[in-house]
Design a protein with these regions (language model features):
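Short acidic/glycine-rich loop or secondary-structure boundary segments that cap or lie
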Residues: 233-235, 285-287, 291, 330-334
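Extracellular/periplasmic, surface-exposed regions of secreted and cell-surface proteins
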Residues: 1-256, 309, 317, 327, ...
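Short edge-strand/loop segments of extracellular domains
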Residues: 89-91, 228, 329-333, 339-344
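Compositionally biased, intrinsically disordered/low-complexity regions enriched for serine, proline
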Residues: 268, 301, 345, 421, ...
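Long amphipathic alpha-helical scaffold regions
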Residues: 66-74, 342-353
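Flexible glycine-rich, low-complexity coil/linker segments exposed to the extracellular/periplasmic environment
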Residues: 1-21, 118-138, 250-299, 348-373
């Protein structure tokens, strides 16, 4: 396999590069579930998973992940009979479960890999050049599953035949976080290794309200509201083997003069996405004045304090109207694009933001990273508005058509925000760059469409 799947291992260093590769991974899973219901009031569910992955070390390829949940439908109890006229449903829920994660891990990160040594030697016996070979990464036979244990308690209610309410509290503890740690060389062959070390806690509440506000013959009005709050804390980054005080993240690579500058820190006691840098006290004579001689400090966080969703649905005779939107509150966004495009020294060869050209900022050290560029990223986006009209059935019966509805939809109609960049809704998929607006995103389009729904 080493020969046939690694053609580059046999190349002569004096010739053009030749390369090939082959990789495979295997996942084996066993799953069992048991459900029990008594009198349609008491419900119990238990599951267990046993997963094995070839990605992990020889000592920890398998992981066991149990879960259990229970519910009590209180509204079915005899003592609730007098209240059923206004409490149609009342259910308490509780659960605990463990899940495993192997995403983001290469197929052979735990193994000792062999490869070319980056050089060649001349073999006098065969009168030819030959490749050198060696170990290409630090093996870790103890690499194992990253696991998350979640506890949740919730309640479901349906009141007055009009109001739906769901409330959940949760606590999620993630253990054995996977991260590439710096290690001494020697005794290790290389200066980094992928290992399980960190612990992370998320806890929060979620509330969902649904209401039938008006229910008349010709006019109805339904409303739905969701609210969520999450608090995240990094509990541990080090153990007895792998040590680190903090992890710098939020790279500003690519910004003029900032190739080695980071805007965030991952540190115990703080959430992911914590901005870290100097505090700007103001601008004097066109120069930034930084507190404490420009010493870095905690500046805020990219994670929202509150997320929300809101929707309304109306009907009036044969017309219908749907409106939906969502928003976030309390998060910070680093306007990296503004930092770069506000560099007045680029003039007149490059186009910069006009507001900075007129601001009087002339600091020759620009761009300077500080909380001057850190903005409130709170926003509310009107996601969608749809207006429809359904033709009366009496007009369709002679054409063999059951239903014909015309509609017009507008999406991303406006955003309410104080953010000065392109869009406050920056990506959070890359945890190393949460809340960074580098201006390299494709703007969310505003779209309009018309159409019809036809059924026979």
């Amino acid at each position: 396999d080493f020969l046939w799947n690694n053609l580059g291992a046999g190349q002569d260093n004096r010739l053009e590069d030749v390369a090939s590769s082959k990789s495979q991974a295997k996942l084996i899973s066993f799953f069992a579930r048991a459900n029990y219901t008594l009198k349609d009031r008491y419900m119990l569910t238990a599951t267990i998973r046993r997963d094995g992955s070839s990605r992990f070390g020889t000592n920890h390829k398998w992981g066991t992940f149990p879960s259990v949940s229970a519910a009590w439908r209180i509204s079915e109890e005899a003592f609730m009979e007098d209240l059923q006229s206004w409490v149609a449903n009342l259910k308490l829920r509780a659960g605990y479960g463990v899940t495993g994660n192997q995403s983001g891990i290469g197929e052979y990160k735990s193994a000792m890999l062999m490869g070319t040594g980056g050089g060649a030697y001349f073999d006098s016996e065969s009168n030819s050049w030959k490749q050198s070979y060696g170990v290409t990464q630090n093996p870790n036979p103890d690499l194992k599953w990253e696991s998350t244990a979640q506890t949740n308690v919730g309640v479901d209610m349906f009141l007055f035949n009009r109001l739906n309410l769901t409330f959940d509290w949760y606590l999620k503890k993630t253990s054995d976080l996977l991260y590439t740690y710096q290690v001494p060389n020697p005794p290790y062959l290389y200066s980094n290794i992928l290992a399980n070390v960190g612990d992370l806690t998320n806890k929060g509440v979620e509330l969902t309200l649904g209401a039938n506000l008006i229910n008349h013959k010709d006019f109805t009005w339904d409303a739905n509201l969701t609210l969520a709050h999450n608090k995240q804390t990094i509990d541990k980054l080090s153990n007895q083997v792998y040590q680190t005080d903090r992890i710098l993240s939020g790279s500003l690579q690519g910004i003029l003069g900032m190739s080695n500058r980071y805007s965030q820190v991952i540190e115990e006691g703080y959430p992911v996405g914590t901005f870290y840098g100097p505090h700007c006290e103001g601008i004097v004579d066109g120069k930034f004045v930084l507190a404490n001689d420009g010493e870095d400090e905690i500046l805020g966080n990219a994670q929202p304090k509150l997320t929300m969703g809101l929707s309304f649905n109306f009907t009036y005779k044969d017309f219908d109207l749907g409106i939906s939107g969502y928003g976030m509150y309390g998060q910070k966004v680093l306007n990296v694009a503004g930092m770069e495009r506000g560099y007045t020294a680029h003039m007149p060869n490059y186009n910069i933001t006009s507001s900075f050209a007129e601001s009087g900022i002339s600091d020759e050290n620009m761009p300077v990273y500080s909380d001057f560029w850190l903005e409130n990223g709170s926003f509310f986006r009107l996601q969608s508005v749809t207006l429809g009209y359904t033709l009366p059935a009496r007009l369709l019966k002679n054409f063999g058509v059951n239903r014909l509805r015309f509609y017009a939809t507008g999406e991303n109609l406006f955003v309410l925000t104080g953010y000065t960049g392109i869009d406050p809704e920056v990506s959070t998929s890359d945890l190393k760059e949460v809340g960074l607006d580098k201006g390299n995103i494709y703007p969310m389009p505003r779209t309009f469409s018309i159409g019809l729904n036809l059924s026979f």
